[in-house]
Amino acid sequence: MGRFSSLCALTAVIHSFGRVSAAIGPVTDLTISNGDVSPDGFTRAAVLANGVFPGPLITGNKGDNFQINVIDNLSNETMLKSTSIHWHGFFQKGTNWADGAAFVNQCPIATGNSFLYDFTATDQAGTFWYHSHLSTQYCDGLRGPMVVYDPSDPHADLYDVDDETTIITLSDWYHTAASLGAAFPIGSDSTLINGLGRFAGGDSTDLAVITVEQGKRYRMRLLSLSCDPNYVFSIDGHNMTIIEADAVNHEPLTVDSIQIYAGQRYSFVLTADQDIDNYFIRALPSAGTTSFDGGINSAILRYSGASEVDPTTTETTSVLPLDEANLVPLDSPAAPGDPNIGGVDYALNLDFNFDGTNFFINDVSFVSPTVPVLLQILSGTTSAADLLPSGSLFAVPSNSTIEISFPITATNAPGAPHPFHLHGHTFSIVRTAGSTDTNFVNPVRRDVVNTGTVGDNVTIRFTTDNPGPWFLHCHIDFHLEAGFAIVFSEDTADVSNTTTPSTAWEDLCPTYNALDSSDL
């Protein structure tokens, strides 16, 4: 594969946290390379997009065609040299080949090569992100924010500012490359907010700063780029009014803390109505060092005119924590199917298990096939029984209602709560974590669900309106690597009529398969 020519110039912007980055898109190059970074004061080699971590913000407008030319310049011997990028939250209708999940939708991009992802944000707007979908590569740095703006946003009258300065990314950061560390790390070394943070026992390095002007209202876009922990997010002295979850508009809901899981996104309106001062932004991880001593797990909300110093504000007990069950979609709120459990065309109960090394769903641990599922289908294999990996493929017909339940017991899913992400769709959560109630009238709708803890039986519903193979997996990346996934093959017989990959896509597998093992 030859390299594609540069598709557009980068427009540099000064982010509110004081570092120069680049807002790019919807037509752009994205160069993946290795480089040393020290976001928390500790220097390590990482996987970078356009030389920065997190990767640059990619933006577009509702209905835009995204053409993102991914150039693989990876060379570090301790990390993978190939890559594959998933555009998290995009439906990819008609472009299943561009979804980016390695060995489900494509072969990886080999080092020294490039690949053009070409897809359209049809009827989609909101907060998205992109990340490597090859092994645990995104834990080493290949992750970044993505926003599709809606010129006719129904919530536009609720805020004054929505731009590059209102992005808030949360990342777990490890001082050891994923391939060299534990299979299941017990907490990260640090929490990074907009790419900056401190680690316990480390120096007082710079914290990210988000600057606001007193009296203005800001649409903050909060993204969890986490590989593992969930976070309890709050801003001292301020409430947050949620208006979006995972690129789905919801009725405004005011909270004072948000528990956010790997892969999830929220937009909330923050009104800068406090005294001119500095306020701690807090992201308490579910594992690792769970305090705020010395400014760890923190960033700074700074009012214009305040001194450039760390805040002195103190943490307060949350009295309005987000209850996911209280989120109501703004449009078409009803869940598909009949208003009772099992009232769908196909109901599937996912039985989890763990043997100390691998996770299992319905007695099968997912192992990536050598031939991508989409390529198998386009090559003529249309029976789920014949598709590989055997036992992990579930065929579902078109225009059907699907219900999935995730029962959690004391032994079947250690490391809970597990955030599960369905590619190619959003879904209605008719039973949320921590509840025995069901809601078929106006349940929260999103693309990553917290499946809860012991005794929970979280249940989701979606409609099969998007032909192709779609991953359903735990978004704790170390758990996905250990087999915690299945694939829905949706309307398999019609995939060849609705999906026409590019010639470059067809070249991916021969190029990748010809690599020496040292260049994978």
Curated annotation (Swiss-Prot):
**Binding sites annotated in the UniProt record for Cu cation 1:** 86, 421
Q: Which GO terms fall under molecular function for this chain's record?
A: copper ion binding; hydroquinone:oxygen oxidoreductase activity
Is this entry keyworded Endoplasmic reticulum? no
Q: Which residues bind Cu cation 4?
A: 418, 474, 479
Report the cofactor remark: Binds 4 Cu cations per monomer.
Which residues are sugar-modified? 73, 76, 239, 399, 497
State which Enzyme Commission number(s) the record gives. Answer: 1.10.3.2
Task: Please cite one Gene Ontology biological process associated with this protein.
Answer: lignin catabolic process
UniProt-annotated location(s): Secreted
Which Pfam families does this entry report, sorted A to Z?
A: Cu-oxidase, Cu-oxidase_2, Cu-oxidase_3
Detail which positions bind Cu cation 3.
Answer: 133, 423, 473
Report one GO cellular component. extracellular region
* Plastocyanin-like domain segment(s): 24-149, 161-303, 370-491
Disulfide bond entries: 107-509, 139-227
**Needs which cofactor?**
Cu cation
Domain of life, per UniProt, equals: Eukaryota
**Primary localization:** secreted
Q: Which family does it belong to?
A: Belongs to the multicopper oxidase family.
Under the subunit heading, UniProt states: Homodimer.
What does this chain do? Lignin degradation and detoxification of lignin-derived products.
Q: What is this protein called?
A: Laccase-4
Give the taxonomic lineage as stored in the record: Eukaryota, Fungi, Dikarya, Basidiomycota, Agaricomycotina
